[in-house]
Amino acid sequence: MTDTIAALVRTVLLVALAALAASAVVAAAEKPGSVTVYVGTYTDGASRGIYRFTFDPATGATTEPVLAVQTKNPSFLALHPTGRFLYAVGEVDRFEGAKTGMVSAFAIDPKTGNLTLLNQKPSEGTGPCHLVVDRTGGNVLVANYGGGTVAVLPIEADGRLKAASSVRAHEGTGPNKSRQEKPHAHGIYLDAAERFAFSPDLGADRVFVYRFDAAKGTLEPHGAAPLAPGSGPRHGAFHPTGKYFYAINELLSTVTAFSYDAEKGALASLQTVTTLPAGFSGTSSTAEVAVSPDGRFVYGSNRGDDSLAVFRVDAATGRLAAAGRVGVGGRTPRHFAIDPTGRFILAAHQDSGTIAVLRLDSKTGMPALVGSPVKVDKAVCLLPAPAR
């Protein structure tokens, strides 16, 4: 009888503990100020689409990830300025029988954070890899790596996408015959006034510049900023002042700092710095670049070295000085995002299937790993979406 009572007590305790754990997760998910983080993935493994988890910017705590919507190869994500819609590239080579990738529009459930597909449209090029929504919420701009094109897709009032209103093809090659045999548009960005768009092209060793008309949904060529041969510019980021632009160069593992003339829409190269430690002899390539919200630091991710390079920004000139490097706690940090408070970096590791949280030192800007990693197979993009 005593054994039976003891077993019953143990069972009751286990059930109670499980209930407490579950309630703690729910409480974390619903905590005021928490951020839903959407995760883009490649779906040729265990992942099935876009995942989401909750992040607490006060503590760095995270919840377990759940599938927000099933979709193919959503390798980059962007949020509508209203917070009601999310857009994702579908990194494929064929869509609706044509040689092109796709862009998907999703409605965000304000209660659960789950996504519902609204519609899909051709990206007007193979292998779409990056996109952005303008601040009017009227257009998606997308870069197609395989096709070497950039396009504008207008957005309806209900969040649905219309067919492309403007498509521009890049030209140029580089000395790296295996990677620069043709143009490879790898990103697209808007300046603060959204008068100009900028597209780093890995194949052409240039950042192409376009005059952007949000009302018409058009891109008009406006020159290009060259980089050193073989650089392979991949992504970019503007400084919060709008006076500088930083391009991260995948093939040479460098960051190029540009000054920016907003009136003319012109970039002028200031310097190029390495993201790797002195004497590094292994194989590595860069992926993402970001500027801290206060503009004091620039971060770049190294795949292979599996680190974040940290640079101090000279506020007067925009030039960079190396501050150090930190391991990211996973393999192949393809993407990372600075949380809206500027206190943390979240890093997505494509090959280890994890997402790390790193706390940023407010004085030095140096990241330090905290907590346990979030597990999402082939995580390649992180999109923090603060509650509205």
PLM segments and residue spans:
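Bacterial N-terminal signal peptides
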Residues: 11-24
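An edge-strand/N-cap motif at the start of beta-rich repeat modules
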Residues: 30-55
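Beta-rich, blade/repeat-based domains predominating
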Residues: 32, 46, 71-82, 124-139, ...
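Short glycine/acidic-enriched loop and turn motifs that connect beta-strands
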Residues: 43-46, 92-96, 146-149, 204-205, ...
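Short loop/turn segments immediately following beta-strands, especially the blade-tip
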Residues: 54-60, 106-113, 153-162, 211-218, ...
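A short beta-strand motif characteristic of beta-propeller blades
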Residues: 63-69, 117-121, 174-178, 220-226, ...
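Blade-loop segments of beta-propeller domains
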Residues: 64-133
